[in-house]
Amino acid sequence: MKESNNYWYVYIILCDDNCYYTGITNNLINRFTKHKNGKGANYTRSHKPLKFLSAWEVDSVNTALSIEHYIKSVNKKIKVLFAENNRLLKQYYVRDIKNKGKRDCNSISVRSVSKKKLNSINTLLNN
């Protein structure tokens, strides 16, 4: 399964203690493998990653970083909503940045990675 490195991904991973980890990458498979092997973020060294719950494709690292920061700022109840229905992220994120008057929301491109693709990636990673 080849991924395009022209895009960045924001993702939520379920960890073994039922907590969520949010991060960014330009390659979902390689990044998860690093997390799983203890070479990713410090957080996933002590909270073992199990699978991707949600992921979104964006056009730039700056957008990815901004969305990652936003997801990390919301409570777990909202993160659960994003994990269950990944199409909600863009709606919530755009509303948040509009309220803060930060940037032009019309230029933001956030595409949900399908549950089918995530399931395929999770299956591949667990074999």
Annotate each PLM feature:
Residues 1-37, 48, 52-55, 65-69, ...:
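GIY-YIG nuclease catalytic motif and its immediate N-terminal context
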Residues 28-29, 60-63, 76:
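Residues at or immediately preceding the N-termini of alpha-helices
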Residues 42, 69-83:
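Short arginine-rich
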Residues 42-48:
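Arginine/glycine-rich "motif VI" loop of SF2 helicases in the C-terminal RecA-like domain
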